[in-house]
A protein has these predicted regions:
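Active-site-adjacent structural elements that line small-molecule/cofactor binding pockets in enzymes
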Residues: 1-142
Length: 142
């Protein structure tokens, strides 16, 4: 997240000049932000809930370090109990929104500034369609 530099500041404090920092970001250009966050939440529930052992899951730990500890453990518990739809519903919209670029193109453009102002040097973009990828490319390349 470009909004929580304290989460990764220690890991990059000794980076050499020119060190590249890449981050994946999902993009969904839509007028319905909540609906646009659904695929993001589905993906997050899988990673937070099911990637790794219950006692050691990088994604659960990262979400906790980002200030969503109770939610991270709830998602993991629900997912591991086979209650995947409930795990998806337990992903906070605030969290999903903070680590993605979802909404009308104007909102996506405005929120790109937070990434530009962060230590991230390159975004690895995933979009739902070629058209959305083209829209975002035009924003970035302007």
């Amino acid at each position: 997240s470009p909004y929580r530099p304290e989460v990764y500041a220690d890991q990059i404090k000794d980076a050499k000049p020119g060190f590249e920092i890449m981050q994946g970001v999902n993009i969904n250009v839509t007028n319905d932000i909540e609906k646009g966050l659904i695929p993001i939440k589905q993906n997050l529930a899988l990673y937070i809930g099911g990637m790794g052992a219950k006692s050691k899951n990088f994604h659960t730990d990262l979400m906790a370090r980002m200030g969503f500890e109770a939610e991270a453990h709830q998602i993991q518990d629900l997912f591991l109990e086979g209650r995947r739809n409930e795990a998806i519903a337990a992903v906070p919209s605030q969290f999903a929104d903070e680590i993605s670029l979802v909404g009308p193109i104007e909102r996506v453009r405005d929120r790109l500034d937070a990434w530009r102002d962060s230590p991230i040097t390159s975004l690895m973009v995933s979009a739902g369609s070629r058209e959305q990828l083209q829209q975002v490319a035009e924003l970035v390349l302007d």
